[in-house]
């Protein structure tokens, strides 16, 4: 089974969500039992809604348990920062044309959220940065075409 990289933050968020779902599980079972007492199951909307909710909850639990089982948790905050862009690093780039500054953290696919500045390790930007060093200039394929950036800083937080 191939391991999938995940940040310590990503693991923590998944474990928190799993805990929430596991606490929800008995409440759903209770709702099914209460709905079952209402009578005819064929026309019992409460029963069918609770069973559907149970199915969704169980699927989410299985999904999270699987993700955690294949996760290779990488905590860069415990690594010595040598200025190299690696998985989990937070990288500040300067657009060579506009001098605009952008900061991204390179994370696993499931953790990516561009609005929060977290990009997937498999994204074109991250692939163009991995292995490069602070101070390097890089050409990265973006939706608007090739762009040149300078790696201003690399942090392991």
Curated annotation (Swiss-Prot):
The encoding gene: greA
Residue ranges the record marks as coiled coil: 14-37
InterPro entries: GreA/GreB_C_sf (IPR036953), TF_GreA/GreB_CS (IPR018151), Tscrpt_elong_fac_GreA (IPR006359), Tscrpt_elong_fac_GreA/B (IPR028624), Tscrpt_elong_fac_GreA/B_C (IPR001437), Tscrpt_elong_fac_GreA/B_fam (IPR023459), Tscrpt_elong_fac_GreA/B_N (IPR022691), Tscrpt_elong_fac_GreA/B_N_sf (IPR036805)
GO biological process, one term: regulation of DNA-templated transcription elongation
Entry's Gene Ontology molecular function annotations: DNA binding; RNA polymerase binding
Domain of life per record: Bacteria
Function of the protein: Necessary for efficient RNA polymerase transcription elongation past template-encoded arresting sites. The arresting sites in DNA have the property of trapping a certain fraction of elongating RNA polymerases that pass through, resulting in locked ternary complexes. Cleavage of the nascent transcript by cleavage factors such as GreA or GreB allows the resumption of elongation from the new 3'terminus. GreA releases sequences of 2 to 3 nucleotides.
Keywords, ordered alphabetically: Coiled coil, DNA-binding, Transcription, Transcription regulation
PROSITE patterns the UniProt entry points to: GREAB_1, GREAB_2
Pfam families named in the record: GreA_GreB (PF01272), GreA_GreB_N (PF03449)
UniProt record similarity statement: Belongs to the GreA/GreB family.
Annotated protein name in UniProt: Transcription elongation factor GreA
